[in-house]
Amino acid sequence: MIKKIIAMCLCCISVAGCSAMPMRRDAYVLRIETYLEDKYNEDFVVSKVQRRTDGSVHAIAYPADDSNAVFDAVIPDVNKPDVSDEYIKTMMGHRYANAFSEIMHKYGYDSKFGALIWADSVMPDADKTTDLQEYADNSENAKLNTSGIVNGHIAADTLQNVAKDFYNKYHMGVSLFVYVITDSGDYHSAERLLSSYGRLTMAEAATYNPDDIFIVNCDNNRCQVRKEDGYGNTD
């Protein structure tokens, strides 16, 4: 309650323009934490706060009991009380990524995928326990649009079958970069990075010596898989 009162006072000062000095970093942290805790009834940690030249503030946040569930939180305008966040979208992304890995496991492969969902619009009243099919059906053009790793050599046809199975079960399309890593040490190092940040760039993946790179696209059960050579060229 004390935290909420302090945050409200700081917000009022900012909106009223009572101070010529920008709010300090810890004030932005408190404002975002209070917003998230009131909205989701959970404790959160906010870090990496950056004030942008356009008057917005961007931060990274995660639940206090799950440091791997990292998401973006934004104050669009420091002179207004609004805060936006990607918490539910990120949590749903983790669930879809885990569901894709579960199907991969049925085909005999260990894998790990990032948690990024792209959509024109997402189900507005979803929470982190919303049914996966329901979420996809009530979102517009939603896809699991991210990168991931597979441990062991895999054929393009197998990836295509996994993508089809995923779409048929969850009604969610995919657009994936898949890095095939056969060295177990490199695979587990990449897996730890993905677990911590929920994403893997091509430059980061290159440090783990992928044997193959595949691009997987599946929409409305029309699935294509192409092999990429790491320089933007595909087979």
Language-model features, listed with the residues they occupy:
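C-terminal motif of bacterial Sec signal peptides marking the signal peptidase cleavage site
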Residues: 16-17
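A short, surface-exposed beta-strand/turn
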Residues: 69-93
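Positively charged n-region of N-terminal signal peptides that target proteins for export
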Residues: 1-5
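Exposed beta-strand-loop-beta-strand "reactive/processing" segments of non-cytosolic proteins
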Residues: 42-76
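Metal-dependent nuclease catalytic core centered on acidic motifs
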Residues: 85-198, 207-226, 230-235
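Short, non-transmembrane alpha-helical segments in secretory-pathway proteins
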Residues: 21-47, 96-108
